[in-house]
């Protein structure tokens, strides 16, 4: 019986209705309802307001990864250098040691100071031999042969020490750019190397070809091996030979009085002679 008696049917208590709603909420969702919800969820991913930011973010991540791999990836030593770099790319780094008159080691610093090298705490260049071990690239200067220092029981050539001392003073602790030609059999990279110096008269910061500078000072000869010679092009080879010719004419370095010295021996002749003697 309704109470009060004058109340309408629409004003009846809804206890039964509430029970029915509660039971309905406990029933499992039908397949049609699930499919409909899934369709609604996927539709959100196809909207422009979702697609455009996602596309921008993905492109940015992939571009950053490619840029890092191409320009900011550091090579710890010569064997680790990607083959795609040879004859196409260069590396930038700081010279940590000079082993001979025509080879030295650099710590690869891709991007240089712009990438934070020697500015950020986690991009410091090691100084100790232990930290630098297996962490530097061994570079062989392209296109030249310097007199040999005494090693492996072999005697020292005339002007070997002068060539080594000059190269050390010219490059040690300086930043250089090496244009890579190829690896050699001694786990080095043959490269044309350039350096910029602040106190370079008459033009400061002028880019200098290290091999060329050694040739014109008479501290090296043009590389004369029958195979494996690397110059970086015919124009550079001609430039090197011209520099050697003038050094001979002026009597610079090792060429001083070489015409009168019957015992004069070029670095290539020295290596050939010593190699034949060791085979005996």
Curated annotation (Swiss-Prot):
Q: Which SMART domains does UniProt cross-reference here?
A: SNc (SM00318)
Q: Which residues form the TNase-like domain?
A: 89-257
Enzyme Commission no? 3.1.-.-
- Species of origin: Emericella nidulans (strain FGSC A4 / ATCC 38163 / CBS 112.46 / NRRL 194 / M139) (Aspergillus nidulans)
Q: Which UniProt keywords apply?
A: Calcium, Endonuclease, Hydrolase, Membrane, Metal-binding, Mitochondrion, Nuclease, Transmembrane, Transmembrane helix
For membrane topology, the record states: Single-pass membrane protein
Family per record: Belongs to the LCL3 family.
- Please state what class of enzyme this protein is: hydrolase
**Location of the protein in the cell:** Mitochondrion; Membrane
Q: List GO molecular-function terms, semicolon-separated.
A: endonuclease activity; metal ion binding
UniProt gene name: lcl3
Protein name per Swiss-Prot or TrEMBL: Probable endonuclease lcl3
Q: Where is the catalytic site?
A: 140, 148, 188
């Amino acid at each position: 019986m309704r109470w009060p008696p004058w109340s309408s049917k629409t004003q009846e208590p809804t206890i039964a209705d509430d029970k029915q709603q509660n039971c309905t909420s406990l029933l499992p969702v039908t397949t049609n309802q699930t499919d409909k919800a899934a369709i609604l969820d996927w539709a959100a991913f196809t909207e422009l307001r979702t697609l455009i930011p996602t596309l921008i973010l993905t492109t940015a991540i992939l571009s950053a990864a490619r840029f890092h791999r191409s320009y900011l990836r550091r090579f710890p030593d010569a064997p680790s250098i990607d083959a795609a770099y040879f004859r196409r790319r260069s590396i930038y780094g700081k010279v940590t040691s000079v082993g001979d008159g025509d080879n030295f080691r650099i710590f690869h610093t891709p991007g240089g100071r712009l990438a934070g090298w020697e500015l950020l705490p986690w991009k410091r260049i090691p100084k100790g031999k232990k930290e630098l071990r297996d962490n530097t690239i061994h570079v062989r200067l392209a296109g030249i042969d310097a007199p040999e220092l005494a090693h492996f029981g072999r005697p020292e050539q005339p002007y070997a020490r002068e060539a080594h001392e000059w190269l050390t003073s010219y490059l040690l602790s300086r930043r250089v750019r090496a244009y890579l030609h190829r690896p050699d059999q001694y786990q080095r990279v043959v490269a044309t190397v350039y350096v910029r110096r602040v106190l370079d008269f008459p033009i400061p910061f002028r880019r200098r070809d290290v091999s060329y500078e050694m040739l014109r000072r008479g501290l090296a000869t043009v590389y004369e091996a029958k195979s494996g010679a690397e110059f970086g092009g015919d124009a550079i080879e001609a430039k090197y030979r011209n520099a050697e010719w003038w050094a001979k004419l002026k009597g610079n370095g090792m060429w001083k009085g070489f015409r009168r010295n019957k015992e004069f021996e070029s670095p290539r002749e020295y290596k050939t002679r010593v190699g034949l003697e060791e085979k005996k």
